[in-house]
């Protein structure tokens, strides 16, 4: 490689029913012929006991230093209890947890009302994700991270209220 990007760190997404180990093996196989340096941010959506006790520590030992969890989207969302377990595991191994913080229930509530009213054009996506959904989830996630003494990176901050919570 001459100039340009010399490294790439995409997300490797674990979905429900998949192991972290298998997810990383699949992504490493896809990157096998890479001519640049690569690593992965891991998306964790199924933090089973095995994932927390064995597979995440193995991933950290294998060079994964950060991962992302979602507080919204039905196929990716983790519960508050799972988030606490993930934060503690990450803290123990010196890894960084990132989160997409939006209140899933509020978004689903808004979507159902918009769809029922016939408001389905793409411009209503933003309406279905009100600032209150972001602010509540950022507040909740940061309080949980502070409670267990774990670092947390909030991604996609798009509101003044959310930014103010992060700044505090």
Residue ranges and their predicted role:
Residues 50-168:
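Histidine/acidic residue-rich metal-binding segments in metalloenzymes
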Residues 1-33:
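Metal-associated gating/positioning segment near the N- to mid-region
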Residues 12-17, 42-48, 73:
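Acidic, glycine-rich active-site loops and adjacent beta-strand->loop/helix elements
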Residues 22, 36-37, 93-95:
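Short acidic, glycine/proline-enriched helix-loop-strand junctions
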Residues 27, 38-40, 70, 125:
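Aromatic side chains
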Residues 8-9, 39, 98, 153:
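Structural detector of well-ordered beta-strand residues that form the stable sheet scaffold
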Residues 3, 36, 62:
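Structured loop/turn residues at beta-strand edges in well-structured enzyme cores
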């Amino acid at each position: 490689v001459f100039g340009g990007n010399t490294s790439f760190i995409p997300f490797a997404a674990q979905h429900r029913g998949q192991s972290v180990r298998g997810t990383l093996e699949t992504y490493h196989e896809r990157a096998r012929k890479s001519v640049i340096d690569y690593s992965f941010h891991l998306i964790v959506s199924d933090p089973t006991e095995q994932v927390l006790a064995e597979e995440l520590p193995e991933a950290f030992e294998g060079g994964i230093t950060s991962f992302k969890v979602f507080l919204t989207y039905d196929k990716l969302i983790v519960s508050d209890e799972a988030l606490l377990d993930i934060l503690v595991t990450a803290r123990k191994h010196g890894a960084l947890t990132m989160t997409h913080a939006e209140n899933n229930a509020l978004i689903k509530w808004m979507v159902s009302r918009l769809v029922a009213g016939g408001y389905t054009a793409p411009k209503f996506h933003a309406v279905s994700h009100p600032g209150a959904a972001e602010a509540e989830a950022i507040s909740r996630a940061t309080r949980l991270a502070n409670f267990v003494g774990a670092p947390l990176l909030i991604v996609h901050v798009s509101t003044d209220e959310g930014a103010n919570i992060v700044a505090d």
